[in-house]
Amino acid sequence: MNIRPLHDRVIVERKEVESKSAGGIVLTGSAAEKSTRGVVLAVGKGRILENGTVLPLDVKVGDTVIFAEGYGTKTEKIDGKEVLVMSENDIMAIVE
């Protein structure tokens, strides 16, 4: 996959998790919630500050992250694979 995000954008592949009810039944389709965890596939060079300085991103390729899914998150299909394009601001944590 050749994709290069610009500035403070990050490309994330969602990690699907198996959803189970309290009784152990596997939930599918609309009953299952989408995961807000993913693996970083690509990162931009950084956020450009008002003075022109480039502030490097905290996340790096290979990091597992927890993200907020909302207005700023865009879903794209690249080479048949669904990925998320988001700003680093939409990433809430890095899982270590």
From Swiss-Prot:
Recorded GO cellular component terms are: cytoplasm
> Entry's Gene3D superfamilies?
GroES chaperonin (2.30.33.40)
Question: Which is a Pfam family this sequence falls into?
Answer: Cpn10
Choose any GO biological process term that the UniProt entry carries and state it: chaperone cofactor-dependent protein refolding
Query: So where does this one cross the membrane?
Result: none
Q: How does it assemble?
A: Heptamer of 7 subunits arranged in a ring. Interacts with the chaperonin GroEL.
Q: Which family does it belong to?
A: Belongs to the GroES chaperonin family.
HAMAP family per the UniProt record, alphabetical: CH10
- State the name under which the record lists this protein: Co-chaperonin GroES
